[in-house]
Amino acid sequence: MEGSTVYFTDFRCPVGTSLTEKLRRLCLAAGIKTIDMDGRFVAIKMHFGELGNLAFLRPNYAKVVADLCREQGGLPFLTDCNTLYPGSRKNALEHLACAQENGFWPMTTGCQILIGDGLRGTDEVEVPVPNGEYCKTAKIGRAIMDADVFISLTHFKGHESTGFGGTIKNIGMGCGSRAGKMEQHASGHPAVQESLCRGCHRCAKECGSDAIVYNEQNKAVIDQDKCKGCGRCIGACNFDAIYSQCDSANEMLDRKMAEYAAAVCYDRPTFHISLVQDISPNCDCHCENDAPILPDIGMFASFDPVALDQACADACLAAAPLPNSQLGQNLAKPGWNCHHDNFKDSNPNIEWKATLEQAEKIGMGTRRYTLKKV
């Protein structure tokens, strides 16, 4: 497969030019108007942010994309699926309320919001995975699969379970119904380093599976039979006592996620946008966001989600770590085993390349790309 084209623009704004205008120009240069949207439903997949988290993409960006779709006669809607864990997005009613509190309204985004897998996260469609090795079918939110055109709008950042959260994760994990998320997460479970555990019980409060108990020494213990492997406890721990086990199970989560993403994108027009800004070390699913580990880099767009993620990852690997951050503090620790990899040095024991490898292997796209600046 030949290399794909990824379009890029930075965040510098001369007087009279806004970031929303730069995003519009990026999408036009990347070819969004070559997609036939006339009279068609267009799903715009994004993350509305957990309440308390402020790293998610602003609704203004969504409006740029929705406006472009409407200009082409499309019927756009913003969408995401419900979560496995407790929080403000575990069912459609609370999910919508969360989105609204974070600023996502029709007047601010230019379109309506539909929760992809319905009220309880059970409104799903089981679809085939093209060339799937780990998943022959994928359980995807029905509203997302009912759309004629699929567009992903992604906040690219670090992630405690997958190294980074990019386009493939936004699609693969984000579009999975509750059962679909369970299937992906079932492979990899976190573990506890007892010597670092302070017995604060915060991880147990965050666990939606009641999988964390405390032993006689008041140290956290994870019941591997109950654990869904969602990784929320990793981000909840302030003492780095809970970590993702770097083994075949964790790698399988990454590969399943790629296969789910391929199922969502298969056999219909797709377009992908990724904003590399507010690069927090962990997922936007947390009710807080830590200081960014890297400076804001820019906006990227492509028809190829694999090339897009690779381009964003390469840009992050080349960036200088910020000192007052999880990454900067890790690198400053005496005796730190430096990986020379900003994702692995921020969240050790995570191998992030498996997702891209699997996506390329099953034909979702290519990791080879040409970067064109807009």
Each model region followed by its residue ranges:
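Extended, low-polarity segments enriched in aliphatic/aromatic residues
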Residues: 2-61, 71-80, 85-374
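Terminal amphipathic helices with adjacent charged low-complexity linkers/tails
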Residues: 66-67
